[in-house]
Amino acid sequence: MSRACLLLVVAAVCLAGREAAAFNYADALDKAILFFEAQRSGKLPPGQRVAWRADSGLSDGSADGVDLAGGYYDAGDNVKFGLPMAFTVTMLSWSVIEFGDMMPARRSSFLGGIFGGGGVAQLDNARAAVRWGADYLLKAATATPDTLYVQVADPYQDHRCWERPEDMDTPRSVYKVTPQSPGSDVAGETAAALAAASIVFRVSDPSYSAKLLDAAQLVFDFADKYRGSYSDSLSSVVCPFYCSHSYHDELLWAASWLHLASPEKKDVYLSYIGSNGHALGAEQDDFTFSWDDKRVATKGFLQSRADGLQLYKAHTDNYICSLVPGANGFQSQYTPGGLLFKEGDSNMQYVTSTAFLLLTYAKYLSSSAATVSCGSTAVSPSTLISLAKKQVDYILGANPAGMSYMVGFGARYPRHVHHRGASMPSVRDHPARIGCDEGFRYLHSPEPDRNLLAGAVVGGPDAGDAFADGRDNYAQAEPSTYTNAPLVGALAFFAGAHKIFTP
């Protein structure tokens, strides 16, 4: 983010409201990033900060003769699902790309040093979170020619047990997509993740960045050449958990990231988007952004970075209008307490992704001195920022329940998270194995979590702002990496803006 653009965006924050920040966004950002260390699979590094975790899944991939150790567990179980993991890496990368300058790596002289955080290594830790996922995706994409490994473990077998990752003895089956069993959706998202991550490391580690970009281009070519959905090829193990509604959006999403990541080939990917956009559904309005649907994000991403895409801007504006209460085109649902509500299972994933898009679009509008036309109403960047702030603040505690939905943040937060590792004694404190069936007593226990899953954002309350803090209540009490990933960017924005305008 350029200095001039940053000042324009932060000026919009001031217009949105001059009151002091209600929350310590920098602390929330630290915790949101820390959560990813609790989700790590594989050989943990010396600098691992979540001390109650230990090595796990070290032989992952051996069932197919490849090394698939590493990566992230997506939520509260011990499965490594490729589609949500790749989306997580894409969104973590986008958070760093868009708002990394607002994450202090060390005391900065930028704008007079006002980003100083006492040496808080937020940017370094965010990059580490990106790299942990990107390393795994790189292995999954390059281990075998014309093959992308997309999942480790049968979720049905995994869910028959309640085990710590360090103890798991359920089959670590390996699943892949190939020319004969295609998966353009998961391959497209993997290409997007690798391309986005390559931008993150372009300056700090050029050789690694180049390796990621090369792999991204290969995986995209594979996804485009062998078209088909992994929900068809691997339906028995990816559905109903992470069924993909279509692979069309992932192909355009991946091409968009490759357009940004490949300066020497940007015209090639832009031409692909122009030639394939109609067939891949780019001319349809859409109102949701998630691990399964990237259409609105792709349009917003592209129209702010490429010329000649006026239709994409119109669709993005329609999406924005759908979110703004009172605007022409408004069609979203909010709880009585003001939380965006899409659906009952893990609703917070839509809240965080929406808040992120609102802020990135506000940044674009500010830099262009533009607004969104919702009928006769001109919606300003400050309105988008204010709306995003309300969503973030709701998560952190400004809600009817007066509780934070981020574990470890504030005085009141969920204490019974649907998460195996958090609910059971740490392997550090209880080295003896806890078996498959034995673990269920921790799932059903009324006792609070044994280990603090700091930074985890749970699924959240229902349409009436009600929340049941129960470990059995996976729809409301389970966290996920793809909920936290876009929140990292949103929190970085508000942490940085707060530092600028607080005396």
Swiss-Prot record:
Pfam families noted in UniProt: Glyco_hydro_9
GO biological process: cell wall organization; cellulose catabolic process
GO molecular function: cellulase activity
Tree of life domain: Eukaryota
Main localisation: secreted
Coiled-coil stretches: none
Family: Belongs to the glycosyl hydrolase 9 (cellulase E) family.
Name under which the protein is recorded: Endoglucanase 4
Species annotation: Oryza sativa subsp. japonica
